[in-house]
């Protein structure tokens, strides 16, 4: 049986830098799955509808940027190899969401948020800090974050124009994936965060959504 490769701290830092560039540079993330929107018919949206949907998808794209950074930060400081591997696998799966959202934003004639580098840095720091405290807290943070993302996606699904099948297909698949990530994190030993902590996280997420809807 081949032995598991052990990376040096320098190797891991280079891997983190590569992950950051693949997350932040346009069209650099290569999805492993085709977009759920691929076979859906493009709706005839009014200018205001297209602008609103683009704003929603921009929020979701930035949310995926934050998820990438969170997972990469946690993978850097995770104590147990299996937790580190789980974080890296989750980050790989989120690349699909990142690419799908960006594709849809471009189709709508809009742009990703210029604030993404800032949110990436903040989320990476939070993820690394959680990993330093304990793997249980790190996994619990993943579960709580994914629960927040699911709530945002439910809200956005309710705001989409009825005929926008492309955006709806993307968000529905993302919703399914994020719920699975949350469940997997708890089953792996993640701590269930109390309601006050989740409330604080929701306030922080509102800052992100307000800021990235337009810019």
Swiss-Prot record:
Binds 2 iron ions per subunit. It is found in: Cell membrane. The keyword Metal-binding applies. It comes from the Bacteria. Its main location: membrane. InterPro entries: COQ7_proteobact, Ferritin-like, Ferritin-like_SF, Ubq_synth_Coq7. GO terms for cellular component: plasma membrane. It catalyses: a 5-methoxy-2-methyl-3-(all-trans-polyprenyl)benzene-1,4-diol + AH2 + O2 = a 3-demethylubiquinol + A + H2O. The keyword Ion transport does not apply. Catalyzes the hydroxylation of 2-nonaprenyl-3-methyl-6-methoxy-1,4-benzoquinol during ubiquinone biosynthesis. Belongs to the COQ7 family. HAMAP family: COQ7. This is 3-demethoxyubiquinol 3-hydroxylase. It comes from Stutzerimonas stutzeri (strain A1501).
